[in-house]
């Protein structure tokens, strides 16, 4: 069972530089940097549905990895994610993962 005491600090991104230096930083830092880059490239263009865009970029790989981890067991996957199974099924269908 998932340890509820774990914080978002457990979600890190590991990178290896050309000089073989390994760095780890929180996932939120990578998301923030990606958003800063995206917003910097807009050149004054209007943006709609940014929230949905970001969620889709995170949600789909999350669903994929959780379903792999639970070997396709939707009940376990839903419990792990803290959502009900019906919601999980809708999300899987949304991304064509059913």
UniProtKB/Swiss-Prot annotation:
One of its GO terms (molecular function) is DNA-binding transcription factor activity. The keyword DNA-binding applies. Residues 74-93 bind DNA. It comes from the Bacteria. Pfam families: HTH_8 (PF02954). Belongs to the transcriptional regulatory Fis family. NCBIfam families: PRK00430.1 (NF001659). Homodimer. Activates ribosomal RNA transcription. Plays a direct role in upstream activation of rRNA promoters. This is DNA-binding protein Fis. It comes from Aliivibrio fischeri (strain ATCC 700601 / ES114). The lineage of its organism: Bacteria, Pseudomonadati, Pseudomonadota, Gammaproteobacteria, Vibrionales.
């Amino acid at each position: 069972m998932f340890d509820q005491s774990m914080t978002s600090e457990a979600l890190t991104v590991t990178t290896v530089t050309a000089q073989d230096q390994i760095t780890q930083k929180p996932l939120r830092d990578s998301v923030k940097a990606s958003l800063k880059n995206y917003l910097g490239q807009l050149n004054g263009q209007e943006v709609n549905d940014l929230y949905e865009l970001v969620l889709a970029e995170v949600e789909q790989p999350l669903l994929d990895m959780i379903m792999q981890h639970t070997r396709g067991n939707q009940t376990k996957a839903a419990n792990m994610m803290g959502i009900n199974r019906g919601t999980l099924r809708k999300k899987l269908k949304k991304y064509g993962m059913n």
